[in-house]
Amino acid sequence: QGDITTLRCDAIVNAANSGMTGCYIPNHRCIDNAIHTYAGVELRLACAELMGQQGYPEPTGQAKITPAFNLPCKYVLHTVGPIIEGGVTRRDREMLASCYRSCLELAAESSLESVAFCCISTGEFHFPNEQAAQIAMETVKQFMNRNTGVKKVIFNVFKDLDKAIYEKLLRAD
């Protein structure tokens, strides 16, 4: 539990918005703002360049990689999680699983061995915390059972609620 921007690992995961250039609300407490703030303006510029080349908003469930610039990790993996409006649908669950899988696949392709995930979509995007944690754990477990590139996955939680949920799920596993 703690601040993902302080972790020394190969990559941390940013729960981004579809514009991918960070949160533009000053002092906003979202993970996207924290990562872009501590990484420095270079991260925002790198993301803007990626998005300019792409020419359209980042789809939900995919992943992009950038250098981490001023962060202690080496890279930032950016993914856009599903936004929940009303109840969680099967498609929402599939898209959230795709976020985790896409980040892990990109990490493996990039020869990264350690990845730290935040709780994708649970904050500003309103995915229920317990369901999101179950999807995260199951998706990562499935990936790790059949792939050898990524050796260490960290579930970095910020809230006490998420810590309790992950501890419960890890004990049950």
Each predicted region: which residue ranges?
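Macrodomain-like recognition of ADP-ribose-binding/processing modules
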Residues: Q1-D173
